[in-house]
Amino acid sequence: MNNLSFSELCCLFCCPPCPGKIASKLAFLPPDPTYTLMCDESGSRWTLHLSERADWQYSSREKDAIECFMTRTSKGNRIACMFVRCSPNAKYTLLFSHGNAVDLGQMSSFYIGLGSRINCNIFSYDYSGYGASSGKPTEKNLYADIEAAWLALRTRYGIRPENVIIYGQSIGTVPSVDLAARYESAAVILHSPLTSGMRVAFPDTKKTYCFDAFPNIDKISKITSPVLIIHGTEDEVIDFSHGLALFERCQRPVEPLWVEGAGHNDVELYGQYLERLKQFVSQELVNL
């Protein structure tokens, strides 16, 4: 998320904008697309083509594990979706909402590595205005985007809610919390989450104002699924206190992972990240 200048902060106090204005200032940094999707003549099969800016070029076997397609949201945008079959015997599929400055091309290699290590398939999507998705990134579009992804995951692949783990990272925790507050799933994982947009910009904010954006703090108590929160103690973008505050409001919290010394973008580089996910998916969920 962007740091606000002094003049922008003054403007925010004196002339409070609508939530959409806060959202666009704080949250959305879509990169130049790192991939394209090409449709065949039948209109039913899409092929992923990665640019040189993507983090990793795939082997044929790895590319065969990735299926991409487009789906339409309730707001009329077409969003790119990606299903990564990481494990033939996976019980769970992660519905993964990524961070604010990446797209599916950049994240896809991470999905392959993560899914194969925790024995889960991964379904992800690009927000409106990201990657091959049409439209513009807004808070309302975030909610419509994940709703369309959830519907596609359930109808196209026949995956039941009890086999879906809703996973959000950074700004991706916003649509994830919104969806999880409305639909029950196997579990919810919130990675470097924020409480609200105003609380990121103004750390001393104690309540949610009508012009606030991304009010996770007011929605998380509505989640009835188990919630695992992961946060770095030295997060320089979304302070560690956000993770703590959300944890305290959960109906069904599980043991959180506070990664000592980790920042905002390196939590997954610490060994305890994978260890905690493996334990949660393979052991704890069975008994919850």
Swiss-Prot record:
It comes from the Eukaryota. GO terms for cellular component: dendritic spine; endosome membrane; glutamatergic synapse; membrane; plasma membrane; postsynaptic density membrane; postsynaptic recycling endosome membrane; recycling endosome membrane. Inhibited by palmostatin-B. The modification Phosphoserine is found at S282. The active site is at S170 (charge relay system), D235 (charge relay system), H264 (charge relay system). Its main location: membrane. Its EC number is 3.1.2.22. One of its GO terms (biological process) is regulation of postsynapse organization. It is a lipid-anchor. Palmitoylated on cysteine residues located in a cysteine cluster at the N-terminus which promotes membrane localization. Palmitoylation is required for post-synaptic localization and for depalmitoylating activity towards DLG4/PSD95. One of its GO terms (molecular function) is palmitoyl-(protein) hydrolase activity. Hydrolyzes fatty acids from S-acylated cysteine residues in proteins. Has depalmitoylating activity towards DLG4/PSD95. Has depalmitoylating activity towards GAP43. Has depalmitoylating activity towards MAP6. Has depalmitoylating activity towards NRAS. Belongs to the AB hydrolase superfamily. ABHD17 family. This is Alpha/beta hydrolase domain-containing protein 17B. It comes from Homo sapiens (Human).
